[in-house]
Every structure is written in C-alpha cells, then in structure tokens.
A protein has these predicted regions:
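Accessory terminal helices/loops
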Residues: 16-25, 220-225, 234-301
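Active-site metal-binding motif and surrounding structural segment of the metallo-beta-lactamase
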Residues: 35, 58-60, 70-114
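Divalent metal-coordination and catalytic microenvironments
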Residues: 41, 55, 65, 79, ...
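Solvent-exposed loop/turn segments at secondary-structure junctions
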Residues: 49-52, 61, 68-71, 95-100, ...
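Conserved beta-strand hairpin/beta-sheet module of binuclear metal-dependent hydrolase folds
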Residues: 34-78, 176-180, 185-188
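Metallo-beta-lactamase
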Residues: 37, 60-61, 68-70, 120-250, ...
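N-terminal secretory signal peptides and thylakoid transit peptides that target proteins
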Residues: 1-18
Length: 301
C-alpha cells in the first residue's frame, strides 16, 4: 500500500543513470519521525526524505517541507506532540517529491503552501528527474503552492523574522533558503547535503556554481553558533557548510581545468578529480563516480 501511494506521484524510469535512492523505496510503515529541538520555537524533524523545519509559538505553526505522502499522518502526529495548533504555513524549499509529498494532506487541512514561482510551475506538469531515474507526476490542486515568490518573502511569526530567499539555479531552478533571523537557524533544503555528495538536478535547472553560490550566501550570514538544517544529513554548523562548499568548488575547478586541457568526459571520470574527497563525502546515495558524472552535467561547457 505504501509503495502504491508513492507511485501515484512517481514513475520509475529504469533506463536512466541510477536507481531511486533507498529512502524513496523503503517501507514507510517502519519510518519514525524524530524531532530535534533547536531553540524555544524551532525544531528539525527527521524521518525519510528531506529534513523538515518546524516553527511553533503563539502566532502560528510554520513548517518547511513535508517528505513523502505516506508519512503525512506520522508528521502530523509528531507536530501534534509539540503543539496542538494546526499548521498554518507550509513552505517548500523546492519541488522534489521527497520534500512535497505531504503537501496535499496539509493543503486539505487548510495550510497555506508557499514556494518559488518555478515550484508551482513544475508541480503543475509531469517532470522528468533524469539523474535519479524518476518521473514526478503532476500534483493535485490541493498540493500546489497558493503563494509563490520570485525573490524573497518574510514571515513575522512566533517572535521571529523568517526570511525565505531564492538562490538561482542551485539544486534546481526553484530553491528557497529559509533564515530564522532571531532564532539563528537556516534551512537550506537540498542546496546542502551534509556529509555527502549532493544531487544536483540539472534536468530541473540545477548547476554546481549555483550550489556554491547558495552556500556562500548562507556562510555570509551565519555565525559559529548558527544551526543549519540541510536537505539531507544531520544538523550542521557553519564549519560543516564551509567544508561542503570547499569540496564542491574544488572538484568543480578540477573538472574545468581538465576540460580546458582537452580531456573527454570519460577521461575526466578516469582521472578521479574527487578522489581525495571520497572518504568524507562518498558515503551517501550519490557514489563517487556518479558524483563526477553528475558534476560534468552541472558545469556548463
């Protein structure tokens, strides 16, 4: 039942480069949603798929992303254990199914869904996510963002100023990063995979330079005490984001240099330009050779 529910959103395309990540294939009945308190009003919820941000307080319940559709009841239960108020605002960091799967359930409950302009555009039509081999089917009306933003938007709730800003052509063409100014928390969505090689969705407008630029923007506003919620991986700090940014910039520069020297894509892969990064970042669902091939697509020729 759980897998059938997911496949109403996804169609797998077996001829494409890699299998769907393990967190999109698991038995959702066994997933536990765990909450980590970051400050008096802000939490990170972890289950399967993208990490969720939660802001509670006297004004409203505000969440960032909502993982997979089959997990919506568990996510609601985890929120209800923290606050009895309904979710009023739901912000999507981008359109991917592991961050928007619960939209329909929350939308039908009355949550106002907020996202970048390109997220709504992509969610209204079928999307081919080439690198992970999946077609994301068009979303029902209740799952669509009702408020869209081109550049940035602010929410003044629960004693905080929550600023969501667009980072162009990063993980996709519709990424929002969310900064809790007073709480000193940042949710980066999939512009940040903590401790692992990232997935950059080049078929949806993503670029390596855009991911580096997104990291640079957050690094400029972060302090050593800032808590950073990545799209995937454990809670991070500024040092972890700096290491991730440096890895991406270093590998990108090496690939650009090899291209400038006339090397073919296969020769660049054989040169292993990320080999010294594999120990620190190669343990995620994007494996070292896949990462280099993805970077070849994510760096314009």
């Amino acid at each position: 039942m759980q897998r059938r529910q997911l496949l109403t959103t996804l169609t797998l395309v077996s001829t494409l480069p890699i299998a769907l990540p393990v967190w999109a294939q698991q038995d959702y009945s066994k997933v536990e949603i765990k909450a980590e308190k970051l400050n008096d009003t802000t939490y990170m919820l972890v289950g399967a798929g993208g990490n969720i941000g939660l802001c509670v307080g006297e004004d409203a319940v505000f969440i960032i992303d909502d993982q997979f559709a089959p997990l919506a009841p568990k996510i609601k239960a985890a929120i209800a254990a923290i606050t009895k108020k309904p979710v009023q605002f739901l912000l999507n960091t981008h359109f991917h199914f592991d961050h928007t799967g619960g939209n329909e359930a929350f939308g039908r409950d009355g949550a106002l869904i907020v996202a970048h302009d390109n997220v709504r555009r992509r969610m209204t039509a079928d999307q081919l996510i080439t690198f992970i081999g999946a077609k994301q089917n068009a979303s029902p009306k209740a799952a669509l963002p009702v408020i869209t933003v081109a550049a940035e938007i602010s929410f003044h709730i629960n004693g905080d100023e929550v600023n969501a800003f667009h980072v162009p052509r990063a993980h996709t063409d519709g990424d929002l990063v969310v900064h809790f100014r007073k709480g000193d928390v940042v949710h980066m969505g999939d512009t940040f995979f903590n401790g692992m090689y990232p997935f950059i969705d080049t078929s949806s407008g993503g670029t390596a330079d855009g991911v580096v630029a997104a990291a640079d923007r957050v690094l400029a506003l972060a302090t050593d005490k800032t808590k950073i919620i990545p799209g995937h991986g454990p809670l991070a700090n500024k040092a972890a984001l700096q290491a991730y940014r440096n890895m991406l910039a270093t590998v990108a520069q090496r690939i650009k240099a090899l291209r400038a020297a006339g090397k073919s894509d296969d020769e660049i892969v054989a040169a292993k330009p990320a080999a010294d990064q594999d120990a620190a970042f190669g343990g995620g669902f994007i494996k070292p050779e896949q990462f280099v091939r993805m970077m070849l697509n994510a760096i314009p020729k």
